[in-house]
Amino acid sequence: MKAVILAGGQGKRLRPLTNDMPKPLVEVAGKPIIVHQIEWLKKYGIREFIVTVGYLKEKFIDYLGSGRKYGAHISYIVEEEPLGTGGGLKNALSLLDKEEMFYVVNGDVITDIDPTKLIGMLDGSVIGAMATVPLPSPYGIVFSDSRDYIILFQEKPVIRDYWINAGLYLFKPEVFKYLPDRGDLERELFPKLADVRKLKTVKYYDFTIWRSIDTLKDLEEAEKIIFKEKISD
Protein backbone atom coordinates (compact mmCIF):
# COMPACT_ATOMS: atom_id res chain seq x y z
CA MET A 1 0.00 0.00 0.00
CA LYS A 2 1.13 3.57 -0.70
CA ALA A 3 1.04 6.65 1.51
CA VAL A 4 0.77 10.26 0.39
CA ILE A 5 2.39 12.91 2.58
CA LEU A 6 0.89 16.36 2.02
CA ALA A 7 3.88 18.68 2.25
CA GLY A 8 3.15 21.61 -0.06
CA GLY A 9 2.26 24.28 2.51
CA GLN A 10 4.34 27.21 3.71
CA GLY A 11 4.06 26.65 7.47
CA LYS A 12 3.62 30.36 8.19
CA ARG A 13 2.76 29.88 11.87
CA LEU A 14 6.07 28.15 12.47
CA ARG A 15 8.16 31.09 11.30
CA PRO A 16 11.03 31.95 11.56
CA LEU A 17 11.92 28.22 11.34
CA THR A 18 10.10 27.95 8.03
CA ASN A 19 11.55 31.05 6.41
CA ASP A 20 14.06 28.88 4.56
CA MET A 21 12.85 25.38 5.42
CA PRO A 22 9.52 23.66 4.61
CA LYS A 23 7.65 22.68 7.77
CA PRO A 24 7.87 18.89 7.27
CA LEU A 25 11.68 19.21 7.25
CA VAL A 26 11.78 21.10 10.56
CA GLU A 27 13.49 18.91 13.15
CA VAL A 28 11.65 17.57 16.17
CA ALA A 29 13.79 15.66 18.68
CA GLY A 30 16.70 15.44 16.28
CA LYS A 31 15.01 14.47 13.02
CA PRO A 32 12.62 16.11 10.52
CA ILE A 33 8.88 15.67 10.95
CA ILE A 34 8.64 13.84 7.63
CA VAL A 35 11.33 11.34 8.66
CA HIS A 36 9.34 10.59 11.84
CA GLN A 37 6.37 9.93 9.55
CA ILE A 38 8.25 7.62 7.19
CA GLU A 39 9.67 5.61 10.10
CA TRP A 40 6.23 5.36 11.74
CA LEU A 41 4.47 4.13 8.60
CA LYS A 42 7.26 1.71 7.75
CA LYS A 43 6.49 -0.12 10.99
CA TYR A 44 3.14 -0.99 9.40
CA GLY A 45 4.62 -2.26 6.16
CA ILE A 46 4.39 0.88 4.05
CA ARG A 47 7.39 1.37 1.77
CA GLU A 48 5.96 3.44 -1.10
CA PHE A 49 5.60 7.17 -0.43
CA ILE A 50 4.33 10.04 -2.56
CA VAL A 51 5.24 13.49 -1.27
CA THR A 52 3.29 16.48 -2.61
CA VAL A 53 5.65 19.46 -2.58
CA GLY A 54 5.48 23.13 -3.50
CA TYR A 55 7.13 25.63 -1.15
CA LEU A 56 10.93 25.10 -1.21
CA LYS A 57 10.38 21.83 -3.07
CA GLU A 58 14.07 21.36 -3.85
CA LYS A 59 14.78 21.03 -0.12
CA PHE A 60 12.71 17.84 0.03
CA ILE A 61 14.36 16.30 -3.00
CA ASP A 62 17.84 17.17 -1.74
CA TYR A 63 17.18 15.81 1.76
CA LEU A 64 15.03 12.74 1.10
CA GLY A 65 16.17 11.79 -2.38
CA SER A 66 14.73 8.52 -3.64
CA GLY A 67 14.04 7.34 -0.08
CA ARG A 68 16.59 4.55 -0.35
CA LYS A 69 18.44 5.60 2.79
CA TYR A 70 15.17 5.12 4.71
CA GLY A 71 14.45 1.72 3.18
CA ALA A 72 11.61 3.23 1.17
CA HIS A 73 10.77 4.56 -2.28
CA ILE A 74 9.72 8.21 -2.57
CA SER A 75 8.03 9.87 -5.55
CA TYR A 76 7.30 13.59 -5.74
CA ILE A 77 4.30 15.50 -7.05
CA VAL A 78 5.19 19.16 -7.59
CA GLU A 79 2.70 22.01 -7.18
CA GLU A 80 3.87 24.88 -9.37
CA GLU A 81 1.42 27.11 -7.49
CA PRO A 82 -0.38 26.53 -4.17
CA LEU A 83 -3.31 24.16 -4.65
CA GLY A 84 -4.24 23.33 -1.07
CA THR A 85 -4.27 19.82 0.34
CA GLY A 86 -7.19 18.76 -1.85
CA GLY A 87 -5.70 20.05 -5.08
CA GLY A 88 -2.30 18.67 -4.16
CA LEU A 89 -3.75 15.21 -3.61
CA LYS A 90 -5.69 15.36 -6.88
CA ASN A 91 -2.38 15.96 -8.67
CA ALA A 92 -1.28 12.48 -7.56
CA LEU A 93 -4.10 10.71 -9.44
CA SER A 94 -1.80 9.03 -11.97
CA LEU A 95 0.19 7.36 -9.17
CA LEU A 96 -2.83 6.16 -7.20
CA ASP A 97 -5.71 5.31 -9.53
CA LYS A 98 -4.70 1.63 -9.74
CA GLU A 99 -4.47 1.18 -5.96
CA GLU A 100 -7.18 -0.60 -4.00
CA MET A 101 -6.76 2.00 -1.25
CA PHE A 102 -4.07 4.39 -0.01
CA TYR A 103 -3.14 6.44 3.05
CA VAL A 104 -2.89 10.22 3.18
CA VAL A 105 -1.07 12.05 5.99
CA ASN A 106 -0.88 15.75 6.76
CA GLY A 107 2.77 16.78 6.58
CA ASP A 108 2.90 18.28 10.08
CA VAL A 109 1.66 15.37 12.22
CA ILE A 110 3.82 13.28 14.55
CA THR A 111 2.09 10.20 15.95
CA ASP A 112 2.36 6.49 16.66
CA ILE A 113 -1.29 5.50 16.13
CA ASP A 114 -1.97 2.29 14.21
CA PRO A 115 -3.05 3.27 10.66
CA THR A 116 -4.23 -0.24 9.80
CA LYS A 117 -7.30 0.22 12.02
CA LEU A 118 -8.74 2.40 9.25
CA ILE A 119 -8.85 -0.44 6.73
CA GLY A 120 -11.97 -2.07 8.15
CA MET A 121 -13.93 1.18 7.69
CA LEU A 122 -13.80 1.12 3.88
CA ASP A 123 -16.71 -1.26 3.49
CA GLY A 124 -19.51 -1.07 0.94
CA SER A 125 -19.94 2.42 -0.49
CA VAL A 126 -17.62 4.09 2.04
CA ILE A 127 -14.60 5.57 0.24
CA GLY A 128 -12.86 7.47 3.03
CA ALA A 129 -11.85 6.88 6.65
CA MET A 130 -10.49 9.54 9.01
CA ALA A 131 -8.50 8.98 12.18
CA THR A 132 -9.74 11.10 15.08
CA VAL A 133 -8.26 11.71 18.52
CA PRO A 134 -9.72 13.27 21.70
CA LEU A 135 -9.55 17.04 21.91
CA PRO A 136 -6.60 18.16 24.07
CA SER A 137 -7.53 21.16 26.18
CA PRO A 138 -5.14 24.10 25.69
CA TYR A 139 -5.76 25.16 29.30
CA GLY A 140 -5.68 23.67 32.76
CA ILE A 141 -9.07 22.90 34.31
CA VAL A 142 -10.23 24.12 37.72
CA PHE A 143 -12.86 22.15 39.68
CA SER A 144 -14.89 23.54 42.59
CA ASP A 145 -17.49 22.14 44.97
CA SER A 146 -21.08 23.29 45.60
CA ARG A 147 -19.81 26.04 47.94
CA ASP A 148 -17.27 27.31 45.37
CA TYR A 149 -14.21 25.98 47.18
CA ILE A 150 -11.59 24.92 44.68
CA ILE A 151 -10.95 21.20 45.11
CA LEU A 152 -8.87 20.12 42.13
CA PHE A 153 -6.60 21.33 39.36
CA GLN A 154 -6.13 19.26 36.21
CA GLU A 155 -3.39 20.37 33.83
CA LYS A 156 -4.49 20.43 30.16
CA PRO A 157 -6.63 17.28 30.19
CA VAL A 158 -7.89 15.38 27.17
CA ILE A 159 -11.58 16.07 26.58
CA ARG A 160 -12.92 12.68 25.53
CA ASP A 161 -16.41 13.81 24.52
CA TYR A 162 -15.01 15.81 21.60
CA TRP A 163 -12.95 14.47 18.71
CA ILE A 164 -10.62 16.18 16.26
CA ASN A 165 -9.17 15.29 12.89
CA ALA A 166 -5.85 13.48 13.46
CA GLY A 167 -4.50 14.23 9.98
CA LEU A 168 -4.44 10.58 8.86
CA TYR A 169 -6.81 9.22 6.23
CA LEU A 170 -7.42 6.13 4.12
CA PHE A 171 -9.14 6.46 0.74
CA LYS A 172 -10.32 4.40 -2.18
CA PRO A 173 -9.44 5.87 -5.62
CA GLU A 174 -13.11 6.84 -6.07
CA VAL A 175 -12.29 9.82 -3.88
CA PHE A 176 -10.70 11.58 -6.86
CA LYS A 177 -14.20 12.27 -8.25
CA TYR A 178 -14.84 14.47 -5.23
CA LEU A 179 -11.49 16.27 -4.99
CA PRO A 180 -11.25 19.95 -5.95
CA ASP A 181 -8.68 21.28 -8.40
CA ARG A 182 -7.82 23.81 -5.73
CA GLY A 183 -8.76 23.86 -2.06
CA ASP A 184 -8.35 21.97 1.19
CA LEU A 185 -9.58 18.52 2.17
CA GLU A 186 -11.24 19.87 5.31
CA ARG A 187 -13.39 22.45 3.50
CA GLU A 188 -13.87 20.97 0.04
CA LEU A 189 -13.82 17.18 0.39
CA PHE A 190 -14.88 15.98 3.82
CA PRO A 191 -18.25 17.82 3.96
CA LYS A 192 -19.15 16.34 0.55
CA LEU A 193 -18.29 12.79 1.62
CA ALA A 194 -20.11 13.22 4.93
CA ASP A 195 -23.27 14.45 3.16
CA VAL A 196 -23.47 11.25 1.07
CA ARG A 197 -22.38 8.98 3.96
CA LYS A 198 -19.15 7.89 2.35
CA LEU A 199 -16.83 8.93 5.19
CA LYS A 200 -16.27 7.06 8.46
CA THR A 201 -13.98 7.54 11.44
CA VAL A 202 -11.85 5.45 13.75
CA LYS A 203 -11.61 6.99 17.22
CA TYR A 204 -8.17 6.46 18.73
CA TYR A 205 -8.29 6.40 22.52
CA ASP A 206 -4.85 5.08 23.41
CA PHE A 207 -1.58 6.27 21.91
CA THR A 208 1.78 7.52 23.12
CA ILE A 209 1.95 10.59 20.94
CA TRP A 210 -0.20 12.62 18.61
CA ARG A 211 0.78 16.17 17.83
CA SER A 212 0.13 18.53 14.95
CA ILE A 213 3.17 20.82 14.70
CA ASP A 214 1.65 24.22 13.94
CA THR A 215 3.56 26.46 16.35
CA LEU A 216 6.82 26.58 18.29
CA LYS A 217 4.84 25.54 21.37
CA ASP A 218 3.62 22.41 19.57
CA LEU A 219 7.20 21.59 18.60
CA GLU A 220 8.37 21.93 22.20
CA GLU A 221 5.54 19.74 23.51
CA ALA A 222 6.23 17.03 20.92
CA GLU A 223 9.92 16.99 21.83
CA LYS A 224 9.08 16.57 25.52
CA ILE A 225 6.92 13.53 24.76
CA ILE A 226 9.47 11.94 22.42
CA PHE A 227 12.38 12.43 24.81
CA LYS A 228 10.27 11.12 27.70
CA GLU A 229 9.52 7.95 25.72
CA LYS A 230 13.20 7.47 24.86
CA ILE A 231 14.11 7.68 28.54
CA SER A 232 11.38 5.22 29.55
CA ASP A 233 12.56 2.76 26.87
What are these regions (language model features)?
Residues 46, 103, 110, 119-120, ...:
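Catalytic-core segments of class I nucleotidyltransferases/pyrophosphorylases
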Residues 20-35:
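Short catalytic helix/loop segments, enriched in acidic residues and glycine
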Residues 29, 55, 80, 113, ...:
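Short beta->alpha linker loops
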Residues 25, 141-144, 201:
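A structural signal for short hydrophobic beta-strand segments in well-ordered beta-sheet cores
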Residues 113-139:
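Conserved donor-nucleotide/metal-binding helix-loop-beta segment in metal-dependent transferases, i.e.
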